[in-house]
Curated annotation (Swiss-Prot):
Enzyme Commission designation: 4.2.1.20
Catalytic activity: (1S,2R)-1-C-(indol-3-yl)glycerol 3-phosphate + L-serine = D-glyceraldehyde 3-phosphate + L-tryptophan + H2O
Name of the protein this chain belongs to: Tryptophan synthase beta chain
Gene3D superfamilies: 3.40.50.1100
GO (cellular component) term, any one: cytoplasm
Purpose of the protein: The beta subunit is responsible for the synthesis of L-tryptophan from indole and L-serine.
Amino-acid biosynthesis among keywords: yes
Keywords: Amino-acid biosynthesis, Aromatic amino acid biosynthesis, Lyase, Pyridoxal phosphate, Tryptophan biosynthesis
GO biological process terms on file: L-tryptophan biosynthetic process
Amino acid sequence: MYPYPNEIGRYGDFGGKFVPETLMQPLDEIQTAFKQIKDDPAFREEYYKLLKDYSGRPTALTYADRVTEYLGGAKIYLKREDLNHTGSHKINNALGQALLAKKMGKTKIIAETGAGQHGVAAATVAAKFGFSCTVFMGEEDVARQSLNVFRMKLLGAEVVPVTSGNGTLKDATNEAIRYWVQHCEDHFYMIGSVVGPHPYPQVVREFQKMIGEEAKDQLKRIEGTMPDKVVACVGGGSNAMGMFQAFLNEDVELIGAEAAGKGIDTPLHAATISKGTVGVIHGSLTYLIQDEFGQIIEPYSISAGLDYPGIGPEHAYLHKSGRVTYDSITDEEAVDALKLLSEKEGILPAIESAHALAKAFKLAKGMDRGQLILVCLSGRGDKDVNTLMNVLEEEVKAHV
């Protein structure tokens, strides 16, 4: 039986609750409320009804037959989280935490966002539940994800651009936590990934674990067996944790794909496992990208959802224990994988998801045709069209 987290929120050496005294009480309140609802049949019934009727679960498992044929190796299956309401896996967690907030009597939501997908999901569930919603987003991400910013505002959320640091996800998270410290009596902080202080990594994992559970059952029905390998992209790591959870006790190879940006031998990457060291970020002990003085080095990725300088503490444990292998994928490799899936399957994935696809495509080529790779397609790529147009401008112009 997989024993983590333990009673103090640790995953082996990692995790915990490294926060100012002012946050201990609100975190304890969330932990108590979460324990009460986690296995409560009435809560689970309400939650899964929302997932089915509002978000459209279960999501499909799609055999990528033309990509499989093109690569000539293992059969590639895609868990289609892009088909969720709002376009990614983020709605799974947002619905769960909104219900938790409701049970706690909170009616004001705070959220941070990078690619904007969690912000959109938070704004969506806030509208559904009649909550107010304030979303913190780095100004760099506001610029490159303008479509999602407009969506959040349409949904009634206030979007607060964060100008400190690099203007990306880390900075948005810092500001969201600062705001929560001052308003924790009536606000609920809806964190978007398996990061932060205990109990957040456990809460988010719980509200994402249906990804792997569904995929496992679907693949068994279709192929009659387990996958040989499971691949997911990793920033903070919530889609990966949701996918991996169902396979941790199975004889299945699990692989996380981090963002190598311009290359892990350059300063422009977000490869936390490959290049990071142990430290504390946003209340949790984990791996992070830092200098010799413990100062966080600003991460970089073409993907707004992966340029986070830390990683969820459970991923840190799974890396150290050897249970999960983590590799890094460059911007160029991710864009190439995105183009291949779009052209061969008619599916435009998010740039985040394209990191997982790139790793899966590399692996598939070296595997037998009878083997299976399961990939978490965490989101759709509509939000990335402006970025892609800039990156592929000359190529696109040639086709117009």
